[in-house]
Amino acid sequence: MGMGMRRERDAEAELNLPPGFRFHPTDDELVEHYLCRKAAGQRLPVPIIAEVDLYKFDPWDLPERALFGAREWYFFTPRDRKYPNGSRPNRAAGNGYWKATGADKPVAPRGRTLGIKKALVFYAGKAPRGVKTDWIMHEYRLADAGRAAAGAKKGSLRLDDWVLCRLYNKKNEWEKMQQGKEVKEEASDMVTSQSHSHTHSWGETRTPESEIVDNDPFPELDSFPAFQPAPPPATAMMVPKKESMDDATAAAAAAATIPRNNSSLFVDLSYDDIQGMYSGLDMLPPGDDFYSSLFASPRVKGTTPRAGAGMGMVPF
């Protein structure tokens, strides 16, 4: 919706204007029904004209301060003198100045001159080298009555309490500029709407990465059992020899140094081989009863023991 249309709808609501209301008064209507009543402090037909000091602003900043209008805007504004004792108005405004063009035109409803109409063009910059713009203003002032009252205040800069101004852009550049802004705003709103469409109702924004994480590309692999590493191989426990050990304990410790799972190593061992194993330990467990039970094993080859020597074998 354009700025002018929004302003008109606001005015329709605030001022209780009928739908489709248009404000296009003639010069006679402006002077007789609005300017004269404003100067006299009377009630206006419709309070639709804003009170703004036009000479404090550039013309392109004024449409936003108007109460109504899309292509032309109306204001009540005071006028000051250029010099304290002179009658020329001060035309400096904003970053430029207004310059009169053409001859003054009397406004005479029903044959009686009530006001004067003057046309002015806005120049940007300082006089006399300002740049002419397309902003036009029609200024309506009362014929002599207002000026006479103001002139009575000697030394005052106020020339007129109120004049009525109609402002417009000759090439309608302001409206085109507003339309360009509206196009940009609509494009921005469209982009924002599209970005919201990619957001779930719970506020989580979906991204390509989240889609990859959420969707398992190989669901059939879930049926395979989890990989379990094999346990490390058993190692032999070494028990150090201590002087305080008795013979039976030392023999058991020596047996523990031999892996139990590798008992096949003793299949071809003879008694002499076994005895040689213990001779390396500088000790032989005493007692023939301890070793005699070992010869019952079918794994050990029978040999003739030496006289006076004990027989022994590590149990497995």
Curated annotation (Swiss-Prot):
Residues 190-200 have a biased composition (Polar residues). It is found in: Nucleus. One of its GO terms (molecular function) is protein homodimerization activity. The keyword Cell wall biogenesis/degradation does not apply. The keyword Transcription applies. Residues 114-176 bind DNA. Its main location: nucleus. Residues 185-210 are annotated as: Disordered. GO terms for biological process: positive regulation of response to salt stress; positive regulation of response to water deprivation; regulation of DNA-templated transcription. One of its GO terms (cellular component) is nucleus. Keywords: Activator, DNA-binding, Nucleus, Stress response, Transcription, Transcription regulation. Induction: Induced by drought stress, salt stress and cold stress. Induced by abscisic acid (ABA). Induced by methyl jasmonate. InterPro entries: NAC-dom, NAC_dom_sf. Residues 17-170 form the NAC domain. Expressed in roots and stamens. Pfam families: NAM. Plants overexpressing NAC002 exhibit improved tolerance to drought and salt stresses. Forms homodimer. Interacts with NAC071. Transcription factor that possesses transactivation activity. Transcription activator involved in response to abiotic stresses. Plays a positive role during dehydration and salt stress. Binds specifically to the 5'-CATGTG-3' motif found in promoters of stress-responsive genes. This is NAC domain-containing protein 2.
